[in-house]
């Protein structure tokens, strides 16, 4: 199990980090905070068996809006749909898991 999270930074409006951790999200925020002058804060998260798959799909979906690394310029509507999109990708992962030929996609 792991978490896909959506973080904000009070110095960058409409720019959000989409990442994953297998540990506590609070610890991940502390790690990221040391390299940032702005306050990093949690907006939302999704606990899942498929964190890598979901994160990869988010990054592909929002690639055109990528700023630096895992930070993306998103609209407020996209931020509000974070959980809905996580669930969509999770459902896709479950379908792929049942397909012997597609299992490697989840790794």
Model-derived features with residue positions:
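Non-catalytic accessory segments flanking enzymatic or RNA/DNA-binding domains
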Residues: 1-107
